[in-house]
């Protein structure tokens, strides 16, 4: 089984914010793979289906970003999945807007959602797709920036990044993640 989680915050208020790009990617995967997000359990919204012969679980934690591990640990336990079965999609301030980077492990890098996951999983070793949202300018506070909407100029870059994320997730169904990582990171 493959568990793909997109991190974000629940509710209309946060729907199109930079911090919710993980949710945006899950929504796109849901459409692309025809997996309806129709179950709520473990403080998450999720759906299951088969893609390229593999069982896939798409998850949007509803715990708010900073508590994402409180949703994903119980889901992994319930479905008898391990951290090696998990792919996490989330926003990254340290990447330029619209760029993606894949990683097989690493620190939280200041991202509280990832910090929560590492804490609840007991390991930093899980696959990640980081989507760049850039850094705030003109003295804007980070919290205001990540909870702000994408500008008209940023939107096409984010849409492109979400499309690339879908392609990377699709590739990871049939290839080892390390190979997918090398392929997609080379094209960044």
UniProtKB/Swiss-Prot annotation:
The record marks 91 as: Stabilizes the basic form of H active site to accept a proton. One of its GO terms (biological process) is rescue of stalled ribosome. It is an enzyme of class 3 (hydrolase). PROSITE patterns: PEPT_TRNA_HYDROL_1, PEPT_TRNA_HYDROL_2. One of its GO terms (cellular component) is cytoplasm. Its EC number is 3.1.1.29. InterPro entries: Pept_tRNA_hydro, Pept_tRNA_hydro_CS, Pept_tRNA_hydro_sf. It is found in: Cytoplasm. It catalyses: an N-acyl-L-alpha-aminoacyl-tRNA + H2O = an N-acyl-L-amino acid + a tRNA + H(+). It comes from the Bacteria. Monomer. Hydrolyzes ribosome-free peptidyl-tRNAs (with 1 or more amino acids incorporated), which drop off the ribosome during protein synthesis, or as a result of ribosome stalling. Catalyzes the release of premature peptidyl moieties from peptidyl-tRNA molecules trapped in stalled 50S ribosomal subunits, and thus maintains levels of free tRNAs and 50S ribosomes. This is Peptidyl-tRNA hydrolase. It comes from Bacillus velezensis (strain DSM 23117 / BGSC 10A6 / LMG 26770 / FZB42). The lineage of its organism: Bacteria, Bacillati, Bacillota, Bacilli, Bacillales. The gene is pth.
């Amino acid at each position: 089984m493959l568990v793909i989680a997109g991190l974000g915050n629940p509710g209309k208020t946060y729907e199109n914010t930079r911090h919710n790009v993980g949710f945006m990617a899950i929504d796109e995967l849901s459409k692309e793979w025809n997996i309806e997000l129709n179950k709520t359990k473990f403080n998450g919204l999720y759906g299951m289906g088969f893609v390229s012969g593999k069982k896939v679980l798409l998850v949007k934690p509803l715990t708010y970003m900073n508590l994402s591990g409180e949703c994903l640990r119980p889901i992994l336990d319930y479905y008898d999945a391990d951290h090696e079965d998990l792919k996490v999609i989330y926003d990254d301030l340290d990447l330029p807007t619209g760029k993606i980077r894949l990683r097989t492990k690493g620190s939280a890098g200041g991202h509280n959602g990832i910090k929560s996951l590492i804490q609840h999983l007991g390991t930093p070793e899980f696959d990640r797709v980081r989507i760049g949202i850039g850094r705030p300018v003109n003295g804007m506070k980070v919290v205001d920036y990540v909870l702000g909407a994408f500008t008209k100029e940023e939107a096409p870059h984010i849409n492109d990044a979400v499309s690339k994320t879908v392609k990377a997730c699709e590739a990871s169904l049939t290839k080892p993640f390390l190979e997918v990582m090398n392929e997609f990171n080379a094209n960044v």
